[in-house]
Amino acid sequence: MQQDDDFQNFVATLESFKDLKSGISGSRIKKLTTYALDHIDIESKIISLIIDYSRLCPDSHKLGSLYIIDSIGRAYLDETRSNSNSSSNKPGTCAHAINTLGEVIQELLSDAIAKSNQDHKEKIRMLLDIWDRSGLFQKSYLNAIRSKCFAMDISNNTANTASQQLSLDPKQRSKQILSNLKKSPPLNLNISLPTDLTSTDPAKQQAALFQVIAALQKHFKTLPSHTSVGTVAPPQAHTITEYGSRRERERERERYNSRRNRSRSPPAPFSQPSTGRKDRYPSVAQDQYSIGAPNTTFGTNNHHLYPDELNVSNNPHYRPKPVSYDSTLPPDHIKVYSRTLFIGGVPLNMKEWDLANVLKPFAEVQSVILNNSRKHAFVKVYSRHEAENVLQNFNKDGALPLRTRWGVGFGPRDCCDYQHGYSIIPMHRLTDADKKWSVSAQWGGTSGQPLVTGIVFEEPDIIVGEGVSSKAISQKMPTDSGRNGPRSGKPNKSGSISSISPVPYGNAPLASPPPQQYVQPMMQQPYGYAPNQPLPSQGPAAAAPPVPQQQFDPTAQLNSLMNMLNQQQQQQQQS
C-alpha cells in the first residue's frame, strides 16, 4: 500500500511540472531522481512516464523534461558503473532503463529543439556535450542530432557520395563499421629493438632510437588505410591535443572516480561536493546545467570540449588558417605560432568547463588537459589571435589565482621560445606524423600548402595514436632554466609577477634589414581581420634566434615509444 502511495506521489510530482511557468524545478527533479534510484525494480514504469511527459508537455517545458531525463539517466548510469551486479540489460535494472532512454532520445531531442527558443536550444546543445562526455548515450545518436539540428558536423567536401557515408540508423551503422573492420588487415608490430637501446653511450643509444622510429614509421606507411577498404569510411578520429601523460591522466581520473558521489549531477561551479542521497541533486535553478558546471567526466581520448567538430564555415568555431613566409629563418626551418596556453594556480575544485568559462570573454577554448594534483592545465584555443588576447587581457586585476603563459603544443620543446610563444623548427626534426598534421589539421597548419623553408603558420591539431610526434620524444624544458625556456610567473621577492608581454602575431617590430615577405595568392585572411583590410605581416618578432642545439632524453623518448607500441597493441586486440 505504501509503495502504491509513493508511486502516485511520483506521478503527481511529475504532473506538477506542467503548472510551473518554466517547467523546471531543482527540488522536484531531485525528488523524482531519489524515487527512481530507490525503486529500480519498477524502472520500466518510471522511464515510460518521463518519456511520455517529454512527448506531451508544452513547448516551453521541453527543456525541463530533458533535465529530468538527464538527472535520472545519469543517476542510473552512475549506479550501473558503481555496482557490477546492475550492469545486465534485464528489465528492472539501471542498464535497461538507460537503454530504453537511448532508443527514444533522438526523437525527444529533435522534438524539443524544433519547439524551443534560441536560449533553450543553446542549453540543449550543452546537454548534448554533457551526455557525450559522461557516456550516457551513444555518440552516434548525439552526433546525428548535432548534424541534423545544429549543423555542426557538416563538411564542405561535396566529393563524398551517399554510399560513402555511414548510416544514421544505429544498427545499420554498427554493421557497416564491423564489416569494414573485418576487411582490415590485422596490425603486425613485430619490430626488433636494437641492442644499443640499452647502451651507456648516448650517441649509440640515440642512433638506435632513431632506427626504431624509422622502422615504426616505415611500418605504419605500409599499413593499408582503413578508409580505403570498401565504400564505407569509418568515423573521423577525435583530434586530441597531446600535452600531458596519458597514464597520469588515467590515475587522476581513477582517484576522482573513487571519491565521487553516486549521482552524475554535480554541485554548482567551485562548490564542494555534497554527500548523501538526499543532497546530491542540486537545483537546476542554481545553474546546474550552465556550461561552466563541472558535471562531466572526460575520457582518456576526449580532451576536446566539442569532439568531432569540423572547421567549416557554418561552425561557430570556424577559424581561417593564416599562412605567411619569413625569409630571415635559417634554411630548412619553419616557424609555428603556438595556440597553447599554460594555466597555473588552478584550484582543486575547478574543472575543464570552469576554465573554459572564465576564459570565454577573451577566447573560445578548444581543448583542456587538466592536472588537478599539480594545479595546472594546458588549454588550447582556436586561434593565435585569441591566445594573445588571453595573455594580454585575462585576469589583469589579479582577482583569480590563475596565471597564464605560453605553452608548446607542437614540435620539439627545445625549439620553442616560451617568452614569445613560437617555435623555429628544423624540418629534419619533424616526424612524418608532424608533417602530415601540419598540412591536414582542422585548426592551424598550412591549409594544404607544402612545408617549405620559411613557412609560418599556427599550431596544428594533432591526432594521438597516428604516429610519433617530435614533441613527445623531446626533452622537457625546466622552468626558469634558460633565456627562452618557460618561466614560473609566480610573484618574485618584490611582489611583482615576472612575465613578458606576448609579441602580437603580425604586429611585431621587424629585424634589420626587414624580411622580405613572399605571400601567395591563396593565403587566407587571419581570424579577426576584415576582408577589406590589408593582410598584416606575420614575420618574425625579432631577429631569428640561433638554432637551438638538439637535446636528447633517451628515457623520455623510449617511454614515448613504448606507450605508442602499447596503444597499437591494444588497438590490435580490440579489433
From Swiss-Prot:
Protein location: Nucleus
Biased composition (Basic and acidic residues): 244-257
Single GO MF descriptor: RNA binding
Compositional bias per record (Polar residues), positions renumbered to this chain: 471-482, 491-501
CID domain location: 1-153
Ranges of Low complexity composition bias in the record: 517-527, 549-575
GO cellular component labels: Nrd1 complex; nucleus
Region (Disordered): 225-282, 468-575
Role description: Plays a role in sequence-specific regulation of nuclear pre-mRNA abundance.
Miscellaneous information on this protein: Present with 19600 molecules/cell in log phase SD medium.
Protein name: Protein NRD1
Organism: Saccharomyces cerevisiae (strain ATCC 204508 / S288c) (Baker's yeast)
